């Protein structure tokens, strides 16, 4: 073989090799492999919704999800919008993980199944991003299907025990239900009930027209509900407790669609 022919053969081989690698790269670009996020380990723990479709989630839209294992979990939420009334304090759910798809199957009440399918896009120690599809089945018929993107943040605090006792405080934001400039008092009991007090002269007395008076704390989410003059009311707060002080904050929406942040500050008195 002459030197000229030898170089021609080598050049042709290199061109063919380049074509092969280019073809492979192109195929991979068209069909990228889904990265293994190791969800069975990384997802374990407590998570709370922080954003919904790229917007900050209102506090009344927040859900706390706890993954105990790759097969079992719990959900806590309070919903009272439209016809969707739910009061779930640690509702047990079955969990299934297949690749980067996490499915939760919950039974909030007899005849009702809620299936939540989460396509996890990313996850680290602090945050998780997922396309979330929720289907509600009532007596075997799919009634509601919602699809949206959600961002979750990991919750490490648990104030369910720290909140027990009596707290007195006042609103610290400009717009709020309790924006009357007065002190307010709540007594949180271990059985999931609470007592709301009002000032009568120099004495604190239970608010007479309130009934039901239930609450739960999951992580740092405080949910309450009560009946006043036959009408059920609910509230949602994110809380912190330290050194005998409790702070509440909530992102809320006004009737015109604008949002504001309500805050409350309390001191433990008993």
Roles of regions detected by a PLM:
Residues 7-14:
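Sec-dependent N-terminal signal peptides
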Residues 39-43, 77-82, 135, 158-163, ...:
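Short beta-strand segments and strand-loop junctions that repeat across beta-rich extracellular domains
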Residues 43, 47, 67, 102-104, ...:
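Fold-core signature of tandem repeat domains
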Residues 134-166, 210-215, 250-270:
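Edge beta-strand at a domain terminus
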Residues 39-58, 152, 156-179, 212-214:
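Tryptophan-anchored aromatic micro-motifs
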Residues 49, 67, 94, 117-122, ...:
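A structural signal for short, hydrophobic beta-strand segments that form beta-sheets
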Residues 58-103, 107-109, 177-225, 229:
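N-terminal glycine/threonine-rich, aromatic-flanked beta-hairpin/loop signature
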Residues 2-5, 17-45, 148-157, 263-270:
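Bacterial Sec-dependent N-terminal signal peptides
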